[in-house]
């Protein structure tokens, strides 16, 4: 998979000798993660988009933008196409196929807060489920523990912060309640809290992993304190 991504143009970080570099990541105790600075996910998307654009240019793929799937068409118990709506004209369109591949991403926006795209709302998964597709492990939803909270009228969702932040930095909360209240009120800044009054709770509770515990563990621990 990594070689395929490199062939598509994903600029993974490299060592001075030219070999692909590795770093530590959440849930792992050894450096085994390929990365592209702090933008690995974005660069993977750009590489995939570039490969798709090439196939479109060669005439092998036809892309329909601004379309929303409304239903799956079944013929003799098999998925043979979809019904979609053109979001520009509002016209209902149908697409026949020998097979239907559902690659709509997650459905995290069924929750109140999410870093995912606003279109990841679970509608595609629900349409497939209604037509008989198996639905396994709905509780296993990927979340991202490091993000910028929604603030103001111009931020529609949480803004994702690279997980490399936990690799390069340290996470802490004030030990004293009065310091936490002062931070919330804006009367004190984090840099004003002395080191002795900071609780590096992930490092304290999970010394083997420290700040690089798995996402679910980091999120639950943060929820307990915030």
Label the model's feature ranges.
Residues 1-11, 130-136, 141:
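Conserved FAD-binding subdomain of flavin-dependent enzymes
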Residues 4-91, 103, 147-162:
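Conserved redox-cofactor binding core of oxidoreductases
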Residues 34-42, 114, 118, 161, ...:
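Hydrophobic alpha-helical scaffolding
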Residues 90, 107-109, 142:
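Glycine-rich nucleotide phosphate-binding loop and flanking beta-alpha elements
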Residues 94-105, 128:
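Short hydrophobic core segments
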Residues 127, 133-226:
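An anion/pyrophosphate-binding glycine-rich loop and adjacent beta-alpha core
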């Amino acid at each position: 998979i990594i070689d395929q991504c490199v062939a598509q143009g994903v600029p993974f970080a490299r060592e001075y000798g030219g070999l692909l570099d590795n770093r530590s990541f959440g849930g792992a105790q050894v450096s085994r993660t390929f990365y592209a600075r702090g933008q690995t996910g974005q660069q993977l998307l750009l590489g995939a988009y570039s490969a798709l654009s090439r196939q479109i240019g060669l005439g092998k793929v036809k892309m329909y933008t601004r379309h929303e799937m409304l239903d799956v068409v079944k013929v003799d118990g098999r998925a043979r196409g979809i019904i979609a709506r053109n979001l520009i004209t509002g016209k209902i369109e149908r697409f026949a196929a020998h097979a239907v591949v559902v690659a709509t991403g997650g459905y995290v926006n069924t929750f109140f807060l999410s870093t995912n795209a606003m279109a990841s709302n679970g509608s595609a998964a629900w349409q497939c489920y209604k037509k008989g597709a198996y639905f396994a492990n709905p509780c296993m939803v990927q979340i991202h523990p490091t993000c910028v909270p929604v603030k103001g009228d111009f931020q529609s969702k949480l803004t994702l912060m690279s997980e490399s932040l936990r690799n390069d930095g340290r996470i802490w909360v004030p030990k004293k309640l009065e310091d936490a209240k002062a931070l919330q009120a804006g009367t004190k800044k984090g840099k004003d809290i002395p080191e002795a009054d900071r609780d590096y709770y992930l490092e304290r509770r999970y010394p083997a992993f420290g700040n690089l515990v798995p996402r679910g563990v980091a999120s639950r621990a943060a929820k307990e304190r915030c």
